[in-house]
Amino acid sequence: PNAKLTVLTNSTQLHKRKIADAVALADKGLLKLDTTDPNQFLIINKPAKGLELNTIMQYIELFPGEKIIQTLVLRGESDGKKIDNTTEESLLALAAFVSKIEAIEWMIYPIDRPTPEKQLEKMSREEMDHIGEFVRKHTNVPVTIRY
């Protein structure tokens, strides 16, 4: 059997030993990371108390299998706070991290369906293409843009 096991995770529980051990059995990990900025992380992910972005990033880096990073790009407001992980600064920081961890792929996608946060924008196809062109110039990792 040549089947490969891939696990999809939002990456928030990788710091727990049992979870990390189970996920480590996979050949590939689709690991969610929308930002490298702690303030944006709080707005986008609304994490449980005590869960910190640097911990998530540490454990993404430690994942022993092939890493595929998934990033949801969004812009607008959430709970009255401005959010935009499509800025050059945000994308450059993500590109640097994705390169550093030697991911085999970086999947970037927009909001696909209505969200409880009505002030979040869905990126147009043209905006997604622009994001793809920009990040490809700043990483050696293959980038897949989903529409």
Predicted regions and their residues:
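Short acidic, glycine/proline-enriched helix-loop-strand junctions
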Residues: E117-Y147
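Conserved AdoMet/S-adenosylmethionine-binding subsite of the radical SAM
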Residues: P1-Y109, P114-E121
